[in-house]
Amino acid sequence: MLVISPKSNVFPTPSTPFEAEVMEFCKLWKAGIEWFSFHTSGSTGQPKAIRIHRDQMRHSALLTGEWLGLEAGDRALLCLPIKFIGGVMVVVRALVWDLQLVIIEPSNQPEIPPNIPIRLTSLVPPQLQYILQHDSLLASFQGAKGILVGGAAISVEIENLAMKQDFPIFLTYGMTETVSHIAYRPISLKTDDYLHPLPGVELKLNEEDCLCIRSALTNNQWIETNDLAELKADQGFRILGRKDFIINSGGMKIIPSQVEKHIQAFFIEKGISALSFVAGIPDDFYGQKAVLFIESPNFFNLGDPLKQYLLQHLSSKQIPKSIICLPKFIFNSNGKLDSLKTVALYLQSSSKESHAHD
């Protein structure tokens, strides 16, 4: 753990490559470098490089600071890799608002230093879940102005844990192309189920009902996402799922996230603690079939109880046709579940096994 003042001209000697990387970025920023290159996380396809101007990053930092009421001297916790936009924007906010930056190694089980009040941090869902499950870590956030969680959807379990806290935790929505978050939804002080855009952000749906975004953060150009959304007249919106994750099963279009939320609720009701997701795999009869993947070394015999529970909320055609248990899911370097690679590895191993028995 290291605490620095990013605007300072003198830094302590870094003890890890990550600390050195953070300090080098601070030096480049203060040197006036105009363009920075980042990679998308790759959680929804191949990572791609994107160049972002410092003015866009500075504007994003100003928006966040004005929204949360940041002040010079506040402490921001950095526990995400800075090669991705979610992590580097923690550093930029510290530079723009003259915050103290607490640097710890990125991990899904972050080693939060005790007795250091944190006012701001950005997390991915596994990190938030770990913190919420450990009372010893929560004390550091009691005076927080904003705990921002993004990069992936949060589970029902995480949301239930967050609602028990009295400090502000926000689910955020954004991407590399929008220079971090452009919208938020309170989950600790829950008001509704809709995300709300930050000032100056315009939203619309395209002909496929995918969300489109325009703001100063996008250089006032419309950006089309692959996220299917429901958009209200007041610009509040909900993400329904990824267009490219839709399962076309025998002519029925299934949105995995709409099925997953009910499976998560069932798991909580039954006291099951396991990561899971729904995805489509090739099927000779259906073309694709929906499958429930569970991270577990042992098979889950959920059988009829899960089916009967899901039938209360979904049509029979939306219910996963089978359950596949894998000992480990694949996560990318930003700590997010990579369901595409997890499924691809399963299909590859299944193909090898079938050929071995030919």
Residue spans for each PLM region:
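Conserved ATP-dependent adenylate/AMP-binding module captured primarily in the ANL superfamily
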Residues: 1-19, 58-77, 107-119
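Gly/Ser/Thr-rich phosphate-binding loop
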Residues: 134-190
